[in-house]
Amino acid sequence: MIKINEHFLKLQSSYLFSEIAKRVNAHQATHPDQSIIKLGIGDATQPLCPACLDAFHKAVDEMGTASSFRGYGPEQGYAFLREAVAANDYQARGADIQPDEVFISDGAKCDTGNFQELFATDIRVAIPDPVYPVYLDTNVMAGRTGAFENGRYGNIVYMECTAQNSFLPAIPKEPADLVYLCFPNNPTGAVATKEYLQAWVDWALDAKALILFDAAYEAFIRDPSIPKTIYEIPGARKVAVEFRSFSKTAGFTGTRCAFSVVPKECMAYDTSGKAHALHALWNRRHCTKFNGVSYPVQRAAEAVYSPEGKAQAKEMIRTYMANADRITAAMAGMGFSYVGGDHSPYIWVDTKTDSWAFFDTLLTKAGVVCTPGGGFGKCGAQYIRLSAFNSYANVDAAMKRMAEVFGKA
């Protein structure tokens, strides 16, 4: 008799964004004439940068002739892209990251979800609340949690992020082996200072713990004093793995390209206490389960680092941040408290009511889709996340609709 992994049964019935889509589709079926403006899921809406598109076309043409055709590529990524990532995203900021420490993949979601496979099932995991659901759900699937009761799983260290601590998770007082951090944060939009991250690195060094650092939204940081990578922090190479994506920085949500950075001195330990390099373990896992990102996509990603690509990507970010500015101004005008939107495409809005109820009200009365904060954890129960990923015209229209429903302060 074939048996299932019963840990899957502990998962909540529906992935957050699937539930949102279900409710939106049901509403549209009964209100076909109402236009819907989606400020929910963080999907890019601007087209690929022209520099990326040109490189993409050229690489596709190369695949059409025998002399330049490419078959299977290196699982870890082509050297040209790994070198561009290391030089531009890390070495240019004084971070000592080498090309062979960069692993190209098809998404940060996949990497953040898969990296936990390297660790024992009896480790203690610390996760922020609210949190991007993938961090938690993949550890549930792996069997690291207890049952789901009163809105939380057993055996997880929940780090509450509230207005009282500026939505910055505090170092846990109880033991933890694996910690997930995301800055600029999804969903709250909060950012971390160098001093704050240094405290985390120092803690991890002392505890022999590991930080999984999601920096997918670093391109939205507008203050040069805010770190864009955890490797700007002394000691981080020993205790942190970083994940990034081209999805939001260059519009690759439908094209799929990202990368993880695993420094060679970053260690984890066996039951005898012997240290093992995570770089070697991740390389083994990566080569076993992944066949690499396609050559044309990697050439398109490489073009992000060209002078033209950098300028075009910055303009794309500027467009989204203009949307964020419009949203934050509207929230202030309507009297809502919020965080984010200054260095992030996400705005975390305090609704003072149940987030799913607010979602339904916003959808039915204004035709605007948000993301209910309750889907990110108990601490998000009265918040919604608004996304700046749309056209300015749509964002402006959505804010006007919201003002009609909720009024102006």
From Swiss-Prot:
Sequence positions that bind substrate: Y15, G42, K109, Y132, N186, N291, R385
Entry EC number(s): 2.6.1.83
Annotated positions of the N6-(pyridoxal phosphate)lysine modification: K248
Cofactor(s) listed in the protein's UniProt record: pyridoxal 5'-phosphate
One Pfam family per UniProt: Aminotran_1_2
Disulphide bridges, residue numbers: none
Ligase in keyword set: no
Pathway: Amino-acid biosynthesis; L-lysine biosynthesis via DAP pathway; LL-2,6-diaminopimelate from (S)-tetrahydrodipicolinate (aminotransferase route): step 1/1
Reactions that this protein is recorded to catalyse: (2S,6S)-2,6-diaminopimelate + 2-oxoglutarate = (S)-2,3,4,5-tetrahydrodipicolinate + L-glutamate + H2O + H(+)
Keywords from the UniProt entry: Aminotransferase, Pyridoxal phosphate, Transferase
Keyword check for Transferase: yes
The protein's enzyme class: transferase
GO biological process annotation, one example: lysine biosynthetic process via diaminopimelate
Annotated InterPro entries: Aminotransferase_I/II_large, DapL/ALD1, PyrdxlP-dep_Trfase, PyrdxlP-dep_Trfase_major, PyrdxlP-dep_Trfase_small
Binding site for pyridoxal 5'-phosphate: Y72, A108, K109, Y132, N186, Y217, S245, F246, S247, R256, N291
Gene Ontology molecular functions: L,L-diaminopimelate aminotransferase activity; pyridoxal phosphate binding
Family classification: Belongs to the class-I pyridoxal-phosphate-dependent aminotransferase family. LL-diaminopimelate aminotransferase subfamily.
Quaternary structure, from the entry: Homodimer.
Described purpose of this protein according to its UniProt entry: Involved in the synthesis of meso-diaminopimelate (m-DAP or DL-DAP), required for both lysine and peptidoglycan biosynthesis. Catalyzes the direct conversion of tetrahydrodipicolinate to LL-diaminopimelate.
Protein name as it appears in the record: LL-diaminopimelate aminotransferase
